[in-house]
Amino acid sequence: GVEIDVTATMDQPVKTVTTIVRGVPRGKLSSSGGDFADVRDNEILLGYPFGGGDLFNAGGLTTPVAVIQSADDAYTTLSSLDDKVRTKRIYLQPGENGYKVELIHEAEGWLDLKTLRVPTWKISHTKTPEAAYAAHYEHIRTAYHFPDYATRPDVPAWLHDTALVLTLHGQHYTGYIFNDYARQLEILRWVNTQIPGKRVLAFLSSWDGRYYWDYPNYTVNDRMGGDAGFRALVTEGQKMGFRMMPMFGMNSANKKQPGWARIADAVTHKVDGDEVDLNWVDWDNDRHQEGWLGYMNLGVPSWRNHLQGRIDEMITKYGVDAYFLDIAGGWINDTKADMHAGMRTMVNELRAKHPNVLCCGEMHYDAMLEFIPLYHSGGGARYAKDYIQRHAKFFSHLSTPAPGRGSSGVHEAGFGRFNTETLQLNATSIPTLQLVDDTFDKQRETMAAVIKQARERAGI
């Protein structure tokens, strides 16, 4: 193999350093532990993390590694041996005799470094896909100090016994209510007749009002049942043993909400200065992206203090057992502060104050496994799952089709197809049941079947 170390110095801040490697064997491509795919003559751009700051232009990497299979027993690994979260891009341009590869490292946007030392790029050759990934995953395990799930201190005892997750869909962006607080409690009472509540985590999605529109207020919603209704949902649910986990947008804030001015300085700017809107969903169905959501940076104190305060109040006031961070893996290289450091600070400070309260993220990139032990997507990549699930567990995504019509509830995906054979369950995730508006009334048999599978898997 080959290790490449570069240091670049200029009389102005260095933004990126690109290492060009020619003659890399062509073949099928795998990235971040995923399956190998024939990419034919296509040019390929991969970005770490969160698409390397361009969500729609690059394939996403949860860790900066890609593997090319050029023969049955020939694998070439392209890996960054960084120990910090910093943007990487891997670009593959096909030629007749091999790839021209660009290995791109982007400097921290908030530092303005005139001398940039590029973390080691490693190119290695192995004979099996397992060997191709082994060294990289061992590197990130030690670089980021991943604790083992079985003994990590941020996993409360009840999570080890969790056999089922219920995703209780609340209020859509439009204001349509799938399940209000009273309805959610009614569902929990029935589920408790099918499986002990103490074995179930209740994920409260859009409990706070109109999905995304009411971010970042995070207060109970009058139309959903108000303070009394939410308090009854939590306390009565907990009496049955259920663990309650409300959802918070980690980096989402509506500029039209009255408190925007107090947090406006925390809106994200990419390394070249362009402001980032969370604009990739057409919420009002006008066939055009929206511009009212700012993409926020937890590294900036105003936003971190606001969000941390809202989560802290929900824990203190209502006694919830966990909190969920939406778009947790959405790190972008900002000009003001490090999102990763800000997230870690918030999670650690909340844990210090509430040591038995769980933090859960939507999706991860590698370094997050140090301080968040549960996610609801990203745990099943073929060659990565054994490494990742040594440190964290997963359940099914909010957008997974619900029984019946396949609704994604509050999530923007709309409708999919519920698989009646698999019940949308898989071996790498905690069994998960989506509950939208008609699930409890019309899909009770399917609910019972999912719960039966969860009981059997847990030996209940």
Q: What feature does the model see in each segment?
A:
Residues G229-T235, P246, M250-E313, K317, ...:
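Active-site-adjacent "subsite" loops/lids of carbohydrate-active enzymes
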Residues L113-K114, V191, G237, L307, ...:
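Conserved, mostly hydrophobic/aromatic
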Residues V191, V200-D208, H306-T335:
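Active-site groove signature of glycoside hydrolases
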Residues L166-V271, N305:
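Aromatic- and glycine-enriched glycan-recognition loops and surfaces
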Residues A163-V165, R199-L201, G241-M245, D321-F324, ...:
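Structural preference for beta-strand elements that scaffold enzyme active sites
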Residues L111-K114, V118-W121, V165-H169, Y173-T174, ...:
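Active-site-proximal substrate-binding groove within the catalytic cores of carbohydrate-active enzymes
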Residues S206-D208, M250-N254, A328-W331, M363-A367:
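Active-site-proximal loop/turn and secondary-structure-junction residues that shape catalytic pockets
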Residues G1-L201, E236, R243:
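Carbohydrate-recognition beta-sandwich/jelly-roll modules
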